[in-house]
Amino acid sequence: MIFTTDDVDRLAEMCEHKIGIEEEGLVIFRPSEVCALTTFSDPANEDFMKSRGLKARKLGNAGGCIVAFPGNVEVGHFSKDLDNHFIEVMTEEALAFFKMRGLDVVRDNNDLLADGQHKVFSTSRATYNEGIVFSAIHISINCDADLVRKICTKEMKKVPKGLSDYGITTEEMLDLVLRVYEESDNVL
C-alpha cells in the first residue's frame, strides 16, 4: 500500500499510527514547506524553528535530524519482515541511477555522497516493539546547507546538497522509488 502526503503533521500521524500497515506499506512525503524530521536522540533547534514559523516533527526512525525542503523525496517503508532489504535495494538502485546520469557518487555508511563530499541521499532503519521495521530514506533534491546548519543541533559532518544542482529532478527520483517498491516482491 502506498500513501503520499505533503503535510508534515499528516506524515507524523501516519508514521506514529502506522496507518494502513498490515504487512507492508510505503509512505512518500513531498514537503510543501521546509520542515525538520527529527529523532528522539537528535532534535531540531526549536527556538530557531519557532522564530521562522517552521515545523519539526519526531518520527520513529533512527539517524539524525533531517531538514526537508520542497521538492525533496522522503520515503518511509514499513514491513513486518525483519529481513526485508528495501534500503539496500533502494540504495543500490540509486547508485546505479546516479552513475548512469554521470554523477560521481560514493557510498559512505548510510549516505550517498556526490563528488565524494556532498550528502544527497541517506538512510536509517529502526525496529518497533510491534515487530515492524521502519526504513527511512531521505533524497535531497533541494537544499540550503546554511539553513540546515541553523536547524540541526549536531555538528554537520557531511555537507548536504540538492540533486537539482546536478540536473536530477524530483520526478526522476519518485519514479525510481516507485519502481523499486513495485518490484520489491521479487527482490526483497
Where are these regions (language model features)?
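Active-site scaffold segments
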Residues: 74, 113, 138-140
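Short amphipathic alpha-helical segments
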Residues: 10, 82-90, 169-173
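Long, positively charged amphipathic alpha-helical accessory segments at protein N-termini or as interdomain linkers
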Residues: 93-106, 123-188
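Short, charged/polar, Gly/Pro-enriched secondary-structure boundary elements
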Residues: 44-45, 119-122
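Contiguous, small/hydrophobic- and glycine-enriched helical/loop subdomains that border
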Residues: 69-110
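Short acidic-glycine loop/turn motifs at beta-strand connectors
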Residues: 32, 115-117, 128-130
